[in-house]
Amino acid sequence: MKRQLLMCTALAMAGLACLVVSPSVIAGLSTAKGPTAKTIQPQPVASSAPDNDESLIQRGYDLAPVPLNLTGKNRALVGLGSYIVNTSGCNDCHTNPPYVAGGDPFAGEPEQINVDCYLSGGVDFGIVISRNLTPNSQGLPAGLTLDQFIHVLRTGEDLKSPGNPPFDHGLLQVMPWPVFGKKSDRDLTAIYEYLRSIPHRSRCLSPA
């Protein structure tokens, strides 16, 4: 080991890099066998990765297309909910029409969301019309309490209407509730808190 250090010093003086490895480490590497031979234990990603909630919350506020009423609301959940809602295509089905004239990105135009009808429902899918998600006069998004809101997204059960043939048991159609139902309680609560903060709008129906 002493000889190795002397050689390393000489190399360093010559401007060359040097790595000294102890004999015990070399012995450990040479005698290791099979899949259990590990000299370094990697740290779990979760423990070393930074918490990016703050960036998602700020991104949510940046994406919100309407003024938000934050009185009595959890600001962090509102921001996170805005991020989820505004990056999950909710506007495409729950705003009628989703974009103002000249603001449809699918037509190659700069995106301009229709804020006058934002998330107020009214898109006609033939036998299904999208729901108004804005707060009612009691401040309840879609007229649902938080528990009801989470129940709907977990089960798809339509609490507003009975089942209509061919759709039995009042299950929501078109709305991708099986996807949203897999989100955490915190994420669903954040969506609800965001919807509580947006302005009320009457349903915007399609022109006759």
Regions of interest found by a model, annotated:
Residues 1-4:
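Positively charged n-region of N-terminal signal peptides that target proteins for export
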Residues 52-86, 100:
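Electrostatic cytochrome c docking/interface patches
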